Amino acid sequence: MSNIKLFFLVFIMSSNFILSQDMENKLANEKSLYLKQHATNPVNWYPWGNQALDSAKNSDKLLLISVGYSSCHWCHVMEEESFTDNDVAQVMNSNFVNIKVDREERPDLDEIYMKALVLMTGSGGWPMNIIALPDGTPIWGGTYVPKTQWIQVLNQVSGFYKTRKPDVLEYANSVREGVKKEALVKPSPRNETYSTELQIELAEKAFIYSDKINGGIGNGQKFPLPSMLNFFLRFSNEYSNQDMKDFVYTTLMKISRGGINDRIDGGFHRYTVDNTWHIPHFEKMLYDNAQLLSIYSNAFKVFKDERFKSELYNIHRFLESKMTGEDNLIYSSISADTNYKDGTKSEGDFYVWESEELKKILKDDFKWVSEYYNINQTGYWENDRYVFYQTISDKEYCEKQGVNLTQFNKKLNRINSLLKIEREKRVHPIIDSKIIFSWNALTIRGLVDSYKTTKDPVFLNKALLINNSLSKKMIDKNIIQH
């Protein structure tokens, strides 16, 4: 074989090797559970890094940056519909350099692109999908998009970039400048004071969106928003605002009684899809439960309602039984979905109940439970499945049943314990064992607040265990690991 032929053979083989290396999914060796969950997609995902950015610049391809987290229900829906589909993957791989980002691993990237998404669309959420120039400047953004519409978006944006590049660059520059202006807004110095009139004005503007009947903010999906509730509670005490105080009480009671509250294991789901706190998306996030410890602690001090105190113990029980690792640090989240061995997924299976199932487990107690937790049209979700949902107070229910509160609590605890035993036999949703320093710090604060309120050392001891582990494992030479 001549030297020229040998040269071309080696060149072609090496070129094909480089091409095959470039055209493959690169997530298998990542640490993030979320990224690993996408490692078998036909989409040629990169993790964020120089390799992906250089590939986009060298090929003059747009970046497609998809941001989510392992416990996000709609992230998994979009994966199943689009990212596991060969036709969609072909469009994505041909026209884009595709990057997967775990927002919990890279909150810096999540913050930057969320600002851009809100700037471009007026709202945000996850999964967050951004199409950007090879240098990372956004030109299109969206959240969950159904498969057919997703393909249309991909073709339209990539086609626009190829045929009207100057217009795309001009728009990208406007987005870049908008994000820069957002970044220029600096927080006020901590010692800066505001007039009473301004504080009242700002609080009342925020309060406009409160739902006085069902609690929470707005009339659609409901998120607990514990930091906002804490603000309203402090403001109502300082300025004797009874409307705000009543709103906080209503919200916390509705959350406690709602389907957003896991009455069996303790802990709260991230949000509900309705405005009455009934049907949750079933993921559980550490940062929500950590902050809910604080607001229920503060609320118990103000309202002296034992229901609020009981939620402190329920959250503690959840953290202890489901979220604590061997090193005493707290995991980040539990998925909304149950993953079965046959490859199928189903949202909420671990948490919901069928009426016939409850009848077999509870026997004579079924009627009691069906009235308390509304195993009827009020508590119905879908496919003969129910989400436990309380609509009257424990006191009202006791009066209706002709029992005292002590008898009631004893029976409820026995029934919940029985249901917990049965539920533990189910396939469990995936726990993301990622340790996030700031979320563990929030948990310490919530536990300390709970200790101050109850004087129960169980909360302080838990806080000290977490604090000691954080100090040993996540602080090195005064540098804090994220």
Feature-to-residue mapping (PLM):
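Catalytic cores of carbohydrate-active enzymes
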Residues: 323-332, 458-482
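Short alpha-helical "patches" and their helix-cap loops
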Residues: 5, 10, 243-251, 458-465
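Replace the tail clause
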Residues: 20-446, 450-454, 481-482
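Bacterial Sec-dependent N-terminal signal peptides
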Residues: 1-22
